[in-house]
């Protein structure tokens, strides 16, 4: 065992003394040492229930014959960090989390890991660490929140009933009393936000990848099932250690293709593009950005999930969960191993029935193509990403007038000030991985766009990214970004921009000679943040089309 490095031999007397100083008895020293990386915090509703899950994981580890050690991992709530300086830190924490898990596991020679996670950047950061370390690992996602409940059966969700409600109030569609009702009911308790936003999409993809047990991706945070899954995960990690099953045996090219297909079939968050690219890189799997679009063209969207659709995570779980989606996708799913020991196809074969009102058959899809499309053109030579499942039919092809803003705050001021009108294309730039820095989510502008009723007449393009709660004609991840001198930096007020999602095009309708002249006089702006770790991050982070990872190269 790896932990024998710190447990065996006369020269390890000091190490054993320190371990015994934590209360570990001699009788337990020969057992596998299992690290439980817990991202508990009472700052985030998605993580407040983790103390309970920690107990069940620990019980499972002891039942399986291991010894559990807990260590803490930070968590940032994107919703709370949204719309201010805090959002600069969200995506970069993904890298910090991966580095922290690696550091603790290597420094203490842990035999295996249980990664307790839930919200947006924490789950991919944990998975990056698992792939990098390649020691036996299982992931427990803490589960989605229940829908908020109102009179006459009304169900509330976080994004629709907060960010979009705020804009509806500003537009005079609802009054202050209704806005207060939304605020009080949008988040009824523990769990990740109720729709197919980034946290829940990543939980689903973690299960699809084979890194968590069946139903873990959809079982509600408040459920007894979630606690049983936590216990079973604790037992299973000891089995994985004894059998030498490691993440790179599970995180194969086939596993990533399966995850992408499930993401596309459900209409998941566009953030998953960044995260899957980053995880694949750590796993040594070649996964070009174009893969998402290739699979999108042959994978129908078979569920209508909130925020763009009607169903919540609790509906998806009751309808069959991830294995139900695998069953409906049938032969397009490749056989790939999982931590349970069964392959993906074997798991799908165990499903007896699926609620086809929620998870439709591929013969009767919600849309013929998957939820995400990758666009290219002279505005995005290295690509851009759109969650096409959230775009209305009239906006799938659109041409409009550029309105340019060099930060999210400036764009929000224009939107809330009534300065954006039908036919505009809102351009938000210098918000990429380097330029932000941190590639902030543009949820406030996109939700405002929808709340003001402009979702069928105004598009938004950015080198930043979007929340999983975003819907509407919003194109992000434009690469190269403005801070690197990408074409988005050359757009000027009044330019015409053409969006053509069916044909995967994003074009700036300006003659190349004019763009060349603009390029000759372009000067990179001063960094927005010059001190602290974000200043270091901006120097080493890569472009969105490679996953916005940090590298020493």
Curated annotation (Swiss-Prot):
Cofactor: binding comment: Binds 1 [2Fe-2S] cluster per subunit. This cluster acts as a Lewis acid cofactor.
Residues bearing the modification N6-carboxylysine: 121
Residues reported in the UniProt entry to bind Mg(2+): 78, 120-121, 441
Cofactors demanded by this protein: [2Fe-2S] cluster; Mg(2+)
One term under GO cellular component: cytosol
Example of a GO MF term: magnesium ion binding
Annotated residues for binding of [2Fe-2S] cluster: 119, 193
Pathway info: Amino-acid biosynthesis; L-isoleucine biosynthesis; L-isoleucine from 2-oxobutanoate: step 3/4; Amino-acid biosynthesis; L-valine biosynthesis; L-valine from pyruvate: step 3/4
Keywords attached to this entry: 2Fe-2S, Amino-acid biosynthesis, Branched-chain amino acid biosynthesis, Iron, Iron-sulfur, Lyase, Magnesium, Metal-binding
Enzyme class, first EC level, given as a word: lyase
Disulfide bonds: none
Swiss-Prot/TrEMBL catalytic activity: (2R)-2,3-dihydroxy-3-methylbutanoate = 3-methyl-2-oxobutanoate + H2O; (2R,3R)-2,3-dihydroxy-3-methylpentanoate = (S)-3-methyl-2-oxopentanoate + H2O
Gene Ontology BP, a term: isoleucine biosynthetic process
EC number(s) recorded for this UniProt protein: 4.2.1.9
Family: Belongs to the IlvD/Edd family.
Record's subunit section: Homodimer.
HAMAP family assigned: IlvD
Protein name: Dihydroxy-acid dehydratase
Species of origin: Geobacter metallireducens (strain ATCC 53774 / DSM 7210 / GS-15)
Name of the encoding gene: ilvD
